[in-house]
């Protein structure tokens, strides 16, 4: 059975998109899933840095090999984090990032689905051709928003586009742990503003004060037993979200 592509996206930077991608990877890892994280935040990718991965290959090198008939195996371009999680890193050089063409994205995802149970794609917050292609080829897209008026207004615009194009394969997560001082809008107000439901909420209690320590150590939060115990409610919520994102029910719903 082919793996499922789950893209993680937003309409504003700094909303916790990369951390959420890594947390999902940790949950799938604990479930025994083989996971590939593809960093397609091409100009500001943070996956390899967050995991302390010293990658020698990246997605640009893979695409360059494809374009010049040198490509043979996806594994030649991924870097292993642990026994269940591999990473296809973003380019280190922004000049190379500019050369990544959207037409190669479906090919990369097809190769990845053959090798992995779950393919997590960390995107940028810019709705460009590459991100639109990723969403088109995703089994599900997780959209992340915060209690921020600019963020919510932009999310409203994206949701409107999805509805106009009859796109249904997405869930929306409200991340209250990112800016704990922002509580301007109630959940009802947020739903009204974006014109859609909030499927999952990460509470402000999940704010990790010493998160820099975990980043320095290259840790995934959901693989840390102490964090999982102390923040059990939010972790359980993320586990439910992770299972929902790969649930076969979306096929039955025409997603």
Model-inferred region functions:
Residues 1-35:
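Walker A (P-loop) phosphate-binding motif
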Residues 1-5, 160-165, 169-170, 215, ...:
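Acidic-aromatic/histidine active-site loop/patch
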Residues 28-87:
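Phosphate-binding loop that captures ATP/GTP phosphates
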Residues 66-130:
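Cytosolic-facing regulatory segments adjacent to core modules
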Residues 111, 126-148:
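Inter-motif core of Ras-like GTPase G domains
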Residues 138-192:
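C-terminal structural cap/anchor segments
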């Amino acid at each position: 059975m082919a793996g499922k592509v789950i893209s993680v996206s937003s309409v504003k930077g700094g909303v916790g998109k990369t951390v959420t991608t890594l947390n999902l990877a940790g949950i799938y890892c604990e479930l025994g899933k083989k996971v590939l994280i593809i960093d397609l935040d091409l100009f500001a990718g943070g996956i390899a840095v967050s995991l302390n991965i010293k990658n020698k290959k990246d997605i640009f090198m893979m695409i360059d090999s494809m374009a010049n008939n040198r490509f043979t195996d996806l594994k030649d371009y991924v870097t292993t984090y642990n026994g269940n999680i591999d990473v296809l890193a973003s380019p280190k050089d922004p000049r190379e990032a500019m050369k990544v063409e959207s037409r190669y994205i479906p090919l990369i995802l097809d190769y990845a689905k053959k090798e992995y149970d779950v393919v997590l794609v960390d995107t940028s917050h810019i709705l460009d051709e590459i991100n639109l292609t990723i969403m088109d080829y995703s089994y599900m897209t997780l959209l992340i928003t915060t209690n921020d008026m600019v963020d919510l207004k932009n999310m409203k615009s994206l949701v409107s586009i999805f509805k106009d194009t009859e796109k249904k394969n997405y869930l929306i997560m409200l991340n209250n742990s990112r800016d704990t001082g922002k509580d301007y809008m109630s959940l009802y107000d947020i739903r009204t503003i974006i014109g859609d439901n909030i499927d999952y909420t990460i509470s402000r209690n999940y704010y990790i004060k010493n998160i820099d320590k975990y980043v320095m150590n290259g840790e995934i939060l959901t693989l840390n037993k102490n964090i999982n115990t102390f923040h059990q409610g939010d972790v359980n919520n993320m586990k439910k979200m992770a299972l929902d994102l790969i649930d076969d029910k979306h096929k039955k719903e025409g997603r």
